[in-house]
């Protein structure tokens, strides 16, 4: 009987004591750091344009950007940047200083506005090629299966040779 009671006490302790496996995360860096790294090791840049108040941005962080296939591919093939569309700090890029425009309560960052062609939508995913040229800005929440297709299409520069519709039909998901 003592052994039974002891096992009832020990087993739950052991179950809850097991550390959870470490979750992989995307190596988010600043825009400036991505530009700097690109000089010595050119890679495309994925930019997640978000705001602090955006519910769908938080949902995308908690789901799409936690999917292991997505995390691994982005970390291997892109410089990943989180760009707060309402940040107040200046960003220097291509001999231009991008600033926050607006007042304390409402405004946007010029870089976010430039990348999104003035069509402010959050979240938005922006792809720059290795030469730091805008390839595509995609507005809205992206579920993991769609993101997986997009990062492969952009990361491997398939867009240079193949239409999206053809690629979309041929793509084999790992999710």
Pin down the residues of each PLM region.
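Hydrophobic h-region of N-terminal signal peptides that target proteins for export
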Residues: 8-17
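Short active-site neighborhood of thiol/selenol oxidoreductases, capturing the structured segment around
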Residues: 41-55, 80
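A short, hydrophobic beta-strand/beta-hairpin element that forms part of a small beta-sheet core
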Residues: 80, 111-114, 120-138
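A short beta-strand-turn-helix
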Residues: 27-45, 74
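Typically the conserved alpha-helix immediately C-terminal to a functionally engaged Cys/Sec
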Residues: 58-75
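Thiol-/selenol-based redox modules, centered on thioredoxin-like
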Residues: 134-175
């Amino acid at each position: 009987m003592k052994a039974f009671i002891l096992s009832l006490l020990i087993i739950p302790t052991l179950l809850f004591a097991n550390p959870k496996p470490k979750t992989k995360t995307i190596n988010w860096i600043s825009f400036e750091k991505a530009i700097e790294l690109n000089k010595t090791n050119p890679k495309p840049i994925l930019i997640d344009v978000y705001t602090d108040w955006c519910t769908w941005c938080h949902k995308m962080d908690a789901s799409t950007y936690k999917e292991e296939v997505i995390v691994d591919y982005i970390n291997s093939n892109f410089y990943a940047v989180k760009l707060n569309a309402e940040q107040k700090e200046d960003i220097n890029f291509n001999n231009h200083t991008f600033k926050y425009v607006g007042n304390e309560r409402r405004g946007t960052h010029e870089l976010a506005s430039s990348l999104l062609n003035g069509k402010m939508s959050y979240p938005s995913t922006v792809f720059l090629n290795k030469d730091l040229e805008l390839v595509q800005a995609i507005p809205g929440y992206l579920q993991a299966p769609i993101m997986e297709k997009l990062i492969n299409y952009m990361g491997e520069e398939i867009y240079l040779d193949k239409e999206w519709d053809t690629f979309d039909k041929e793509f084999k998901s790992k999710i």
